[in-house]
Regions:
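Short acidic-hydrophobic, aromatic-tinged amphipathic segments that line or gate anion-handling sites
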Residues: 1-3, 29, 66-69, 158-167
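Amphipathic alpha-helical repeat scaffolds
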Residues: 31, 113-121, 231-239
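Short beta->alpha connector loops at strand-helix junctions that form conserved
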Residues: 68-71, 110, 136-137, 159, ...
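Glycine/small-residue-rich loop that forms an oxyanion/phosphate-binding "nest" at active or ligand-binding sites
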Residues: 65-90
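RNA substrate-binding interface of SAM-dependent RNA methyltransferases
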Residues: 98-184
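Active-site/ligand-binding-proximal alpha/beta "capping" segment
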Residues: 179-231
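Boundary-proximal intrinsically disordered activation/regulatory segments immediately upstream
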Residues: 1-54, 139-140
């Protein structure tokens, strides 16, 4: 059994920083379920695990593989409750094609800031069969360790892109672009298409003005009962779940 050097632990901890992740083009994942989901989807540069985990997974393909004690793993881990394995994976390179949005249902995020929200939205996209999420340049980094953990493995199947949202939406032509607004139409009373882009906004400010002007289908998630005083808004991840569920419900009945 090897022990992790101080330099290796320092390197693992440095992956909390976007600058280092970007330079190295890697990301960190922890825990048996998450690491197990990602192995086979992304090249693994480094994996450290306890002997009990390695015995259950004898055929790991990693550039560097180290058996470590639980104590060592605890020192390296970024989690409050360290688990049996952590791994460093290479970031994938994806090409963003507007045709994907014309042909299927995709999500767009306008400056979502919370890593947990982004991770949960990726997990939701995975559940609802949405393959692409297009993020504004100021949206939180998908490879933030907190985001990766919150995806629960969804990052293996959902492609996340960063671009200028206004420019991308303009490239879609007359493709349906949906967004939620207080003055939008009740989404339960509107026919929703099986293709197009659903735009979700920033936690505090909603969808930005420039992007809002480009949305051609304004929706509203009604509270119940109508007109009753309620909380100001839904969390962006919860709102995404409600909207995606209605899109898929309507698609199932067509």
């Amino acid at each position: 059994m090897a022990s992790l050097s101080k330099n290796k632990i320092k390197y693992i901890h440095s992956l909390e920083l976007k600058k280092i992740r970007k330079e190295e083009r890697v990301f960190l994942a922890e825990g048996p379920k998450l690491v197990g989901d990602l192995l086979g989807h992304f090249p693994c540069r480094f994996l450290a695990a306890t002997s009990s985990w390695l015995q259950k997974h004898p055929d790991i393909d990693a550039s560097e593989l180290v058996e470590v004690s639980q104590e060592d793993l605890s020192r390296a881990s970024l989690l409050k409750t360290p688990q049996q394995v952590l791994a460093i994976f290479e970031q994938p390179q994806y090409t963003l094609d507007p045709e994907a949005v014309r042909q299927s249902l995709c999500l767009a995020l306008d400056d979502v800031q919370d890593p947990g929200n982004l991770g949960t939205i990726i997990r939701l996209a995975d559940w609802f069969g949405i393959e692409h999420i297009i993020c504004s340049q100021n949206t939180v980094d998908v490879y933030n360790p907190k985001t990766i953990q919150a995806t629960m493995g969804g990052i293996a199947r959902v492609k996340v892109h960063y671009t200028s949202l206004p420019d991308f939406i303009r490239s879609l032509g007359d493709t349906p672009v949906f967004g939620t607004f207080l003055d939008g139409k009740n989404m339960y009373e509107q026919p929703l298409s099986a293709n197009g882009l659903i735009v979700m906004g920033n936690e505090g400010n909603g969808i930005g003005k420039e992007v809002a002007t480009l949305i051609n289908r304004k929706l509203y998630i009604p509270n119940y009962p109508a007109g009753q005083e309620t909380s100001e808004s839904l969390n962006v991840a919860i709102a995404t779940a409600v909207i995606c569920a209605e899109f898929r419900r309507q698609a199932a009945w067509k």
